[in-house]
């Protein structure tokens, strides 16, 4: 489902220009996407929507169980639009979001596996973190994959760092216990790491097939960022 809009490089909207050409390009993208779905035996319907991609997908997320987007385009305007969408959509969507990387930080094409063997999830005591943990466990169990639960401890310079780490470990054990009972065959690895969560999860993305985090979004649990 391609959504297109005219955006200048200073992030202001400009005239759309040749609507027919834009529509034709979008239709070509849809035809290729549907062909891929057909090859996999997946029933697919197509739709072209005119508008800002992020806004369009936020509205569509009201009526879908899952939305999948890329986080890098092929450069230029396409990259700007997809980058903006992948950054803003998870925070405002009404359903879980899967964000699929196109390239790594060095611009190399990503190799995406069709088999999921390792799943990571960022976990804290918030209701969003607990929901992310639940969904990650269900997802990992469905794929018969390992689940790495990561709890980040902010950098501290006090004298009781060991006590704080022990407290985080105890809290993580409490959060994981219901998952172990619900999925007795699921291999769950627990990681307590110092520093910001974003660093730990970014590192995890290099050797995991899926990373799950919660999103506070609209003041409640409104979406997940998967990717």
Q: Predicted segments — roles?
A:
Residues 5, 13-20, 35-67, 180-221:
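Structural beta-alpha unit
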Residues 22-33, 56, 135, 167-175:
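Short, solvent-exposed amphipathic alpha-helices that sit
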């Amino acid at each position: 489902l391609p959504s297109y809009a005219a955006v200048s490089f200073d992030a202001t909207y400009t005239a759309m220009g040749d609507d027919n050409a834009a529509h034709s390009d979008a239709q070509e993208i849809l035809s290729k996407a549907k062909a891929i779905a057909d090859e996999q035996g997946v029933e697919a319907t197509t739709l072209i929507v005119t508008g800002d991609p992020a806004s369009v997908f936020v509205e569509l997320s009201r009526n879908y169980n899952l939305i999948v987007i890329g986080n890098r385009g092929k450069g230029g305007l396409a990259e700007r639009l997809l980058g903006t969408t992948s950054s803003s959509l998870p925070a405002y969507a009404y359903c879980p979001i899967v964000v699929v990387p196109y390239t790594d930080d060095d611009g190399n094409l990503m190799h995406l596996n069709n088999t999921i063997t390792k799943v990571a999830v960022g976990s804290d005591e918030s209701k969003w973190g607990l929901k992310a943990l639940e969904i990650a466990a269900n997802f990992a169990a469905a794929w018969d994959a390992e689940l790495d639960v990561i709890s980040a401890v902010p950098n501290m310079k006090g004298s009781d760092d060991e006590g704080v780490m022990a407290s985080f470990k105890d809290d993580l054990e409490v959060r994981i216990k219901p998952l172990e009972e619900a999925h007795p065959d699921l291999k769950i690895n627990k990681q307590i790491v110092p520093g910001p969560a974003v660093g730990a999860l970014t590192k995890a993305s290099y050797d995991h097939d899926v990373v799950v985090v919660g999103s506070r979004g609209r003041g409640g649990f409104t979406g997940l960022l998967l990717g």
